[in-house]
């Protein structure tokens, strides 16, 4: 493994229809990835893909915070647990789950309920927490401080400023194992706040991701994103951290192996 995409959606269109094309590129650049669920249906697809390509893909299963009002809580909890029990060896994380206050705060209590349910599943089964946090970093800091997870926590699509980075880094003082997954946003010219934050985040806490098919990095902005475009994220992170690209690749792969590919 030379590259790792910690968070992609090969289980979603338009990637799913052209997955063989992407898998060929996985092999070409020696890439592995997490295929991330956002609801029960595409979590099941993520598992099927991980079973079909076990040397390249792991599945993460969960309910996105923006979808919590669309599903039945008890039924979803039961089905998530069943999906996990029947496919444990192919699943790396619970998620993406978390809090999203960007569009509305109407479903805060429901997001809390689904967070606690998925948090418990991850902790009980010793799985990584793949967190989606948008406009809710004070909330996640408070809840992680209170719950003190024993399993690693990934801040998916971390694109915040240095102040939020410092606050989240302080969770290390509570012996919480945290990682910052950096998306293609880092390649954007207007991402200076993220660049400054990256400078203070230790490399041993970094992962790379695409969140494909969204958040396409430069030089492909405006087009569909693919997991193989993670190479552009890694090279940009290396430049910002003033580390050779080969060394940055080695560090990120080491972090990924620690979490997912033992």
UniProtKB/Swiss-Prot annotation:
What cofactor is this protein dependent on? a divalent metal cation
What are the binding positions for a divalent metal cation 2 in this chain? 96, 132, 156
Q: What keywords are assigned to this protein?
A: Hydrolase, Metal-binding
The record's section on CDD domains has: TatD_DNAse (cd01310)
On cofactor binding, the record's note says:
Binds 2 divalent metal cations per subunit.
At the top level, the lineage of the source is Bacteria
List the SUPFAM superfamilies: Metallo-dependent hydrolases (SSF51556)
- What enzyme category does the UniProt record give? hydrolase
What cellular component terms from Gene Ontology apply here?
cytosol
What PROSITE patterns is this protein classified in?
TATD_1 (PS01137), TATD_3 (PS01091)
Answer whether the UniProt record assigns the keyword Metal-binding to this protein: yes
Q: Which family does it belong to?
A: Belongs to the metallo-dependent hydrolases superfamily. TatD-type hydrolase family.
The identity of this protein, by name, is Uncharacterized metal-dependent hydrolase MG009
């Amino acid at each position: 493994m030379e590259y790792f995409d910690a968070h992609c959606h090969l289980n979603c269109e338009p990637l799913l229809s052209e997955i063989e094309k992407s898998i060929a590129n996985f092999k070409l650049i020696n890439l592995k990835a997490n295929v991330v669920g956002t609801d029960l249906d595409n979590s099941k697809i993520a598992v099927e893909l991980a079973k079909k390509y076990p040397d390249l893909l792991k599945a993460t299963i969960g309910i996105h915070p923006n979808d919590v009002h669309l599903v039945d809580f008890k039924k979803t909890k039961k089905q998530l647990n069943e999906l996990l029990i029947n496919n444990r060896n192919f699943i790396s994380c619970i998620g993406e789950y978390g809090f999203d206050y960007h569009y509305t705060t109407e479903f805060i209590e429901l997001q809390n309920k689904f967070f606690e349910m998925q948090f418990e599943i991850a902790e009980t089964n010793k799985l990584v927490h793949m967190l989606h946090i948008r406009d809710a970093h004070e909330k996640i800091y408070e809840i992680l401080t209170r719950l003190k997870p024993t399993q690693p926590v990934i801040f998916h699509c971390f694109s915040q400023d240095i102040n939020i980075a410092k606050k989240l880094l302080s969770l290390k003082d509570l012996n919480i194992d945290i990682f910052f997954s950096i998306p293609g946003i880092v390649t954007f010219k207007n991402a200076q706040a993220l660049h400054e934050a990256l400078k203070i985040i230790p490399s041993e806490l970094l992962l790379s991701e695409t969140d494909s098919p969204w958040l396409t990095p430069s030089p492909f902005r405006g087009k569909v994103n693919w997991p193989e475009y993670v190479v552009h994220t890694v090279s940009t992170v290396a430049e910002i951290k003033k580390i050779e690209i080969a060394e940055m690749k080695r560090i990120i792969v080491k972090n990924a192996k620690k979490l997912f590919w033992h």
